[in-house]
Regions:
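Conserved, mostly hydrophobic/aromatic
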Residues: 23, 42, 49-52, 119, ...
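Histidine/lysine/aspartate-rich catalytic loop segments that bind and position anionic ligands
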Residues: 148-186
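Active-site-adjacent beta->alpha loops and helix N-cap segments on the catalytic face
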Residues: 1-12, 55-67, 74-87, 108-113, ...
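Conserved beta-strand positions in the central sheet of alpha/beta enzyme cores
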Residues: 50, 128, 153, 175-176, ...
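Glycine-rich beta-to-alpha transition loops that act as phosphate-gripper elements at the mouths
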Residues: 26-31, 101-109, 133-134, 155-159, ...
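Alpha/beta catalytic cores of nucleotide-metabolism and tRNA/nucleoside-modifying enzymes
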Residues: 201-209, 220-223, 228, 232-267
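Short beta-strand/loop segments at the ligand-binding rim of alpha/beta enzyme cores
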Residues: 14-25, 93-103, 144-154, 202-216
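Catalytic cores of alpha/beta
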Residues: 31-43, 159-170, 205-206, 213-231
Length: 267
């Protein structure tokens, strides 16, 4: 049986001839209730929802996501409360894929198998573990499969071809390509042409594997990368939550409008 993630790519890439739009927000920002309202709202336009679990030392996250994480942690967000957010979201959006993204030490402290059991129970479709690279992640990725969860491998511009081939061979339904050597939310320092050139190299290794591009993608840059299988926007959304809070505006409405704009740029 095909996963929800692969079905979304089939619909977006093959039927609608466009990339899938993946949105990233931090679970619990700016509160548990608001976080759920945001993902419920943006799922009107996003094809796949990415939800990050906040961490006090997020090595790959840029300033905007760190601010979001800090707000969520200040509001007392925990892994069990993140599972509650996902459970509530899935009741309303059963067919919408949700990818949980975070750091391995939180999973390790919670207990790997216990974590995966809870992910399956609430309806998590995929996992990205930033600080668990290949081949160290092989055992964990295998366990994910047992619980019908996609483990999403990461590739970067410095990944050698030989290593890339091995990672892609071991990957599940999709691969996440980090477009540039930076934390998330940095300005796009590499031209879209260069990013797509690297993307095409990855696609040639196995054209059947779906490749999404993340880091530095905004309303300004998204349309230039529409040849990709999928595009991830995160920092711009976290920045909008901060702006909405500062201006005392409705972050749910503002994010819905932003994701609608992003979607229209790739249709």
């Amino acid at each position: 049986m095909k996963s929800k993630i692969s079905l979304v790519f089939k619909k977006c890439n093959e039927v609608e001839k466009r990339p899938a739009l993946l949105t990233y927000t931090v679970a619990g920002d700016s509160s548990k209730k608001k976080s759920l309202e945001i993902i419920n709202s943006i799922s009107d336009h996003a094809d796949i929802i990415e939800l990050g679990f906040p961490h006090n030392t997020p090595i790959a996250d840029g300033g905007q996501i760190q601010v979001s994480s800090h707000r969520a942690l200040q509001n007392g967000i925990t892994l069990p409360s993140i599972f509650e957010i996902i459970k509530s979201f899935k009741k309303k959006n059963k067919s919408k894929p949700l990818i949980l993204m975070g750091y391995f030490n939180i999973i390790f402290q919670y207990g790997e198998i216990n974590f995966l059991k809870n992910c399956k129970k609430v309806g998590v479709d995929g996992l990205i573990v930033v600080d668990l690279p290949w081949p160290e992640n092989k055992k964990f990725a295998k366990n994910c499969k047992k619980y019908f969860i996609d483990f999403i491998q990461l590739l970067s511009p410095t990944t050698p071809i030989k290593r890339m081939k091995k990672i892609i061979k071991d990957s599940h339904d999709m691969v996440y390509y980090i477009s540039m050597l930076s934390t998330t939310g940095g300005k796009l320092k590499v031209s879209p042409k260069k990013i797509l050139k690297n993307y095409n190299i990855i696609k040639k290794i196995n054209p059947l594997k779906k490749v999404v591009i993340g880091f530095g993608i905004t309303t300004k840059t998204i349309s230039s990368l529409r040849k990709a299988d999928g595009l991830v926007v995160g920092s711009q959304l976290c920045k909008e939550i901060t702006r909405s809070i500062t201006k005392r505006q409705n972050s749910v409405t503002n994010l819905n409008k932003m994701v609608y704009k992003l979607k229209n740029k790739i249709i």
